[in-house]
From Swiss-Prot:
Family: Belongs to the bacterial ribosomal protein bL31 family. Type A subfamily.
InterPro entries recorded: Ribosomal_bL28/bL31-like_sf, Ribosomal_bL31, Ribosomal_bL31_A, Ribosomal_bL31_sf
Originating gene: rpmE
Species of origin: Chlorobaculum tepidum (strain ATCC 49652 / DSM 12025 / NBRC 103806 / TLS)
Protein name per its UniProtKB record: Large ribosomal subunit protein bL31
Transmembrane residue ranges: none
Cellular component GO terms, alphabetical: ribonucleoprotein complex; ribosome
Keyword set, alphabetical order: Ribonucleoprotein, Ribosomal protein, RNA-binding, rRNA-binding
Biological function: Binds the 23S rRNA.
Keyword Secreted belongs to the record: no
Pfam families membership: Ribosomal_L31
Amino acid sequence: MKPEIHPKYTKVTVNCANCGTTFETRSTRNNNIKVDICSKCHPFYTGKQVLVDTAGRVDRFNKRFAKAAPKASAQ
């Protein structure tokens, strides 16, 4: 291996934004790493399914654009 061309491999702290878990690992990044979701809180690993209620958003979208549809067809 050539000297002085490889990145330094240091210890970094990984912080989960969802559950607040922190753990140490090694990486070529110099600073801490923030992740949105980790293995402690991910539904695949925990076995808990989180349902996202999008029905209200879809209904609101359809109502908003149902009013706009007759105006477009009248022209």
